[in-house]
Amino acid sequence: DQDDPELVDVIAGQVLPRRGILARPDEILVTMGAQNALWMAAQLLLGPGRRAAIENPGYPSLRAILAARGAEVAAVDVDTDGLPPDAIPRGADVVFVTPSHQCPTTATMPLARRDALLARAEAEDMLIVEDDYDFEMSFLAPASPALKSLDRTGRVIHVGSFSKSI
């Protein structure tokens, strides 16, 4: 099965550029929703013996998705700026993060911390799954750039959703 080419063109040409992301149509996968995209990422990236780091508190269903894959899951406490990169346990293979509007704290990860997270991922060969949850709900300041827009080494998988904007 193939995604609707017109929808993919709109995502590539209009939606993702608003987040600072340039992607070719063949780099875009339309799923049934963000939770389905997180499930797919877990299926592809994790399994027994693999390690994932998630935010604490964070999206409750994510922990269940990762546990079902048999991955070791480390819950990293967030602070007022979101997930602290230096608190991610050594040996993590994948980090799941909501940098633009952390749920449930609503913390927004500052640019310096985003850069530090990307540097840590590069140095330790980690992948990052960015759940761009609720980015458009930033009413006090312009939306922060997507983590994927800062990624120069291909370590970030961006998960976006239309559910809050439709």
Identify the role of each PLM range:
Residues 157-166:
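PLP-dependent aminotransferase class I/II
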Residues 1-124, 136-157:
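Conserved core of the PLP fold type I
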